[in-house]
Amino acid sequence: MPPIFANIILAFATAFLGTLIFRSHLMSSLLCLEGMMLSMFILSTLIILNMHLTVSFMMPILLLVFAACEAAIGLALLVMVSNTYGLDYIKNLNLLQC
């Protein structure tokens, strides 16, 4: 395994660990999810280029489209929660609260 793949997998693992540790704040979770998506994009691009898979050249672009949609929905949710409650705690997203 080349060192670049190990570094990207380490970046993904770090972002995933950050998601598990900082799961109480919505902004921290969104940043960690973006880090995971970025490392997945770079890893998929490198794998496709190294294996010369001409059929799958569109997959990293599709991953970026989904990452942009996830970021837009996450930021809209963050603005909604911040305006409603004044905080960005994930526990405020519980729909069963009275």
Curated annotation (Swiss-Prot):
GO terms for biological process: ATP synthesis coupled electron transport. One of its GO terms (molecular function) is NADH dehydrogenase (ubiquinone) activity. It is a multi-pass membrane protein. It catalyses: a ubiquinone + NADH + 5 H(+)(in) = a ubiquinol + NAD(+) + 4 H(+)(out). Keywords: Electron transport, Membrane, Mitochondrion, Mitochondrion inner membrane, NAD, Respiratory chain, Translocase, Transmembrane, Transmembrane helix, Transport, Ubiquinone. It is found in: Mitochondrion inner membrane. The keyword Transmembrane helix applies. InterPro entries: NADH_UbQ_OxRdtase_chain4L/K, NUOK/Mnh_C1-like. The keyword Electron transport applies. It comes from the Eukaryota. GO terms for cellular component: mitochondrial inner membrane; respiratory chain complex I. Its EC number is 7.1.1.2. Signal peptide: none annotated. The chain crosses the membrane at residues 2-22, 29-49, 61-81. It is an enzyme of class 7 (translocase). Its main location: mitochondrion. Belongs to the complex I subunit 4L family. Core subunit of respiratory chain NADH dehydrogenase (Complex I) which is composed of 45 different subunits. Core subunit of the mitochondrial membrane respiratory chain NADH dehydrogenase (Complex I) which catalyzes electron transfer from NADH through the respiratory chain, using ubiquinone as an electron acceptor. Part of the enzyme membrane arm which is embedded in the lipid bilayer and involved in proton translocation. This is NADH-ubiquinone oxidoreductase chain 4L. It comes from Avahi unicolor (Sambirano woolly lemur). The gene is MT-ND4L.
